[in-house]
Design a protein with these regions (language model features):
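N-terminal hydrophobic/helix-forming segments and targeting peptides
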Residues: 6, 12-457
Length: 457
């Protein structure tokens, strides 16, 4: 059950709908995802994905078993802002063998072995020539790096440095059975309509191959969130985008400029399955989503860090570009490029932890409830404190919980700040208590006829 809901605000700001006075406290069970996140990641992990191609379609097909996903295909060459949709890439096999037929590197064993978007090749190459197309990690000699060449007419292999150091033959037979041809780029979209036209935009990238944290963790968590939101009617709509990184976000923005004024809040999800602390990267201009995320993380019981916006990272770069400047932040645990498993074969099913996935899901669920329930109230008569005792709202023992889940102090904070100027989030931040407790206090005061709803924040 949701934490609560304001009166709906119509398209032009008028109040509409009826009060929804629902239970304010949420049990631990309510914060559990409706699917096994770790198992879902495990199902998607073996699939080879890139900006385009069969792997993305297969992945979105798995997501589509859980939500009614709209699949969009955008043709190769389509102009999108300053870019064009690239050629479609598909790969069937790739190997490096000795001349006597011994297979040393096989794409079938790990899809990180081939540089993404490698063009087809078949021939015998000298070691020196092959060295220019081999990517390794000398500081992590047993790991396979993840590399791409999306917009380069090139090919390459990625392998453990220890393996490469032992490859001392003069020549090797190389085969990459791939094709780059006109086709399309695929992305998925799922909209849960709200009572108003205003929306929360939630996105993740779906273009990485067998990397569990970056970003199958985001794909799985976003799928579970979409399932959860589809089962409830909120004040806000929720638009979930499963996109190839960069070009996918740019394409969606180019095709949807006319509706961007609906986006009230936005969140990019990535790297949410490791055991590290939460990191929230703020939007470019500062927005309610930034304050809301900081508040939820402060009260979630886990270490966290708030990071200022910078123009490098994930698709928040596109949503926050100056021509759009949407209120979109990014939530992650491990920050790109800062943990040793990043973009290596160590980002595997052992690296992501089921408990971290569930805690990430729970924090985001609380954030969505906050955004949907963030309203502004005003006292009917703000002169002095109202008499709580005759309304059954007074407790002589300091700190004792009222029936609706708020303490007496929560109720006093709410009644003092219910001046038509402070939203529930403003109140929760100032009182330094979880949002749900101020929302519970609002429900009690509204039930008692002490306040009226002024606006939904």
């Amino acid at each position: 059950m949701r934490l609560g809901r304001c009166l709906a605000i119509g398209t032009f700001g008028e109040l509409s709908g009826r009060k929804m006075l629902v239970k304010s406290e949420t049990s631990a069970v309510d914060r559990l995802p409706g699917i096994d996140l770790y198992d879902l990641i495990g199902e998607m992990f073996p699939i080879n994905r890139s900006l385009t191609g069969a792997g993305v379609r297969k992945t979105l097909g798995i997501v589509g078993r859980h939500i009614d996903l709209d699949i969009h295909e955008v043709a190769t060459g389509t102009a999108v802002l300053d870019w064009h949709v690239p050629m479609e890439w598909n790969i069937r096999s790739a190997t490096i063998k000795t001349l006597d037929g011994k297979c040393l590197v096989d794409f079938a064993e790990n899809n990180l072995h081939v540089m993404g978007y490698s063009k087809p090749v078949n021939g015998v190459f000298g070691r020196a020539e092959l060295a220019r197309r081999v990517h390794t990690l000398p500081d992590q000699p047993d790991l396979i790096p993840y590399r791409t060449g999306y917009y380069a007419d090139d090919w390459g292999f990625c392998l453990p440095h220890s393996l490469w150091q032992g490859m001392n033959d003069e020549h090797y037979r190389v085969d990459i059975d791939s094709d780059l041809s006109p086709g399309s780029m695929t992305y998925g979209e799922f909209l849960v309509p709200g009572e108003t036209r205003r929306e929360v935009l939630i996105t993740c990238h779906v273009c990485h191959p067998s990397l569990a944290n970056d970003n199958l963790s985001g794909v799985a968590i976003m799928t579970a969130l979409a399932m959860r939101q589809s089962e409830r009617r909120g004040r806000l709509g929720y638009r979930f985008l499963f996109l190839p990184a960069t070009i996918g976000a740019i394409t969606w923005l180019a095709r949807n400029e006319a509706m961007l004024d609906r986006i009230e809040h936005g969140l990019v999800l990535t790297c949410l399955g490791d055991s590290g602390p939460f990191h929230y990267k703020q939007s470019r201009k500062g927005a309610t989503i930034d304050r809301a995320a900081a508040h939820v993380l402060k009260h979630c019981g886990e270490p966290h860090e708030i990071m200022p916006f910078n123009p490098y990272g994930y698709d928040e770069r596109q949503f926050c570009s100056p021509g759009f400047d949407l209120p979109v932040g990014c939530l992650m645990r491990g920050v790109h490029g800062t943990f040793p498993e990043y973009h290596t074969s160590a980002d595997n099913m052992d690296f992501v932890k089921p408990e971290a996935l569930v805690r990430s899901y729970s924090a985001i669920e609380a954030l969505l409830d906050l955004l949907d329930g963030n309203c502004t109230y005003q006292r009917g008569d703000g002169r002095g404190e109202p008499q709580l005792g005759r309304r059954g709202l007074y407790r002589a023992i300091a700190g004792q919980r009222e029936a609706g889940g708020a303490t007496q102090m929560d109720l006093l904070w709410f009644l003092n700040l219910a001046d038509g100027q402070h939203s529930l989030l403003d109140m929760a931040i100032r009182a330094d208590v979880p949002f749900a407790r101020l929302e519970a206090a609002a429900r009690l005061a509204l039930d008692a006829g002490l306040v009226r709803l002024v606006a939904a924040a």
